[in-house]
Curated annotation (Swiss-Prot):
It is an enzyme of class 3 (hydrolase). It comes from Cicer arietinum (Chickpea). This is Acidic endochitinase. PANTHER family: ACIDIC ENDOCHITINASE, ENDOCHITINASE. Residues 24-293 form the GH18 domain. The keyword Magnesium does not apply. The active site is at E150 (proton donor). GO terms for biological process: chitin catabolic process; polysaccharide catabolic process. Disulfide bonds join C43-C90, C73-C80, C179-C208. This protein functions as a defense against chitin containing fungal pathogens. One of its GO terms (cellular component) is extracellular region. It is found in: Secreted, Extracellular space.
Amino acid sequence: MEKCFNIIPSLLLISLLIKSSNAAGIAVYWGQNGNEGSLQDACNTNNYQFVNIAFLSTFGNGQNPQINLAGHCDPSTNGCTKFSPEIQACQAKGIKVLLSLGGGAGSYSLNSAEEATTLANYLWNNFLGGTSTSRPLGDAVLDGIDFDIESGGQHYDELAKALNGFSQQKVYLSAAPQCPYPDAHLDSAIQTGLFDYVWVQFYNNPQCQYSNGNINNLVNAWNQWTSSQAKQVFLGVPASDAAAPSGGLIPADVLTSQVLPAIKTSPKYGGVMIWDRFNDAQSGYSNAIKGSV
């Protein structure tokens, strides 16, 4: 009989652990404004569960891959290795730190399956669990790779498969498609079912973003995204009007009182993604919403 009584708390513990591991969170992009503070500053807010370092903006088409962290550091002089201890400090707090590929203004493409494999090996050896004498962010081992691909679109499914194939480390994969479904650049990659997190950009796209009190277009697009192969879907929002020139800012009170209640019923709801750390630090957006995410 004693064993029977012990089963119930054990099951409760397992249930709590599962719920905790799938708990919703906030993701943020850091790296595109030298005035946004350090990476560790962002993590020390305790507002974020994911930080995407933006961006590896040059790769493919015979180019040497290169990160561009705006005014934070000069990669050509190994100046970005200073962030290694900050990455490790973030990870020690339980925050997943990923490297984001692409962006809105990069020089990147994948012209063949071979280029996809070559890039995967480069990422593994220079940012993930492999080894290299020239790791741009130092010895810190990142948790995964984010795909913010806003031009081209071929062979990113093969890149995802190659990154997923490194058995020595779980490589978390995330993607940041635009909200019109399916995404013009990342659809084939997302349909592999390999992406742990898909933070959809519900801004700069009038047909599927919040506008003038109307959440219907956003919710309709959200329902399309949650029917995709994504494991978890996040609502991507700008932290201010300045962060989204073509619109989509959802006032924090509207997000918490109207939008989140409408989308959190989905079992694929993962949380909220914020673009970006600089604008969030200025507006206090994550402070205003974190209790409701």
